[in-house]
Amino acid sequence: ADMMAFAEVQPGDKVGELIPGAGFMTRVLSKSVGPTGHVYLFNGPPAAGRAPGFQPVLDDKTNYSNVSFIQTDFTTIAAPEPLALVWTSQNYHDMHNPGRNLDIAKANKAVFAALKPGGVYFVLDHQSAPGVDFDAALHRIDGAKVKAEVLAAGFEFAGESNVLRNPNDPKDKGVFDPS
């Protein structure tokens, strides 16, 4: 609820979610925008022979009829209407994975183009120690690097929240480490 309020998600909003994973935030976004809103999931093609983790949400038309999937290479975000919000949680660092060969600047510009004027690009990810370049093994990224990449696409920085920040996070261990 805190993150939805911070992102100013409203009933009726049309929103996008990049790399929705297993669909946890998809469910939250769907309920937040309500029956007059819509959630567009943007993801690459699924691995061969494997359904995407968010497939159960797409299949549940009783509870999530306002959710649809659009396959993308992330350098184009083909939403059928301007979006109030594009959300990505704990996956921005994945866009830097070497095997993805993604042009981050082009991807961020595609997000910018998909948003209506005043729209929000909401990036939530695990913070690395300052100055640490992207590290796939840790599943973390330097917030300053993210900010620089996003600003370069034409965005204005509107704020950040510490509500999920853990002051005891060592930042030099993988996010799945129990410490």
Each predicted region: which residue ranges?
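A short glycine-rich, Lys/Arg-flanked "PGG" loop and its adjoining helix->strand segment in the class I
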Residues: 30-34, 102-117
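A short acidic, Gly/Pro-enriched loop at the edge of an enzyme's catalytic core
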Residues: 64, 77-87
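Conserved Class I S-adenosyl-L-methionine
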Residues: 133-160
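Conserved class I S-adenosyl-L-methionine
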Residues: 10-21
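Glycine-rich SAM-binding Motif I of class I
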Residues: 23-27
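Conserved beta-strand signature within the Rossmann-like core of class I S-adenosyl-L-methionine
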Residues: 108, 118-127
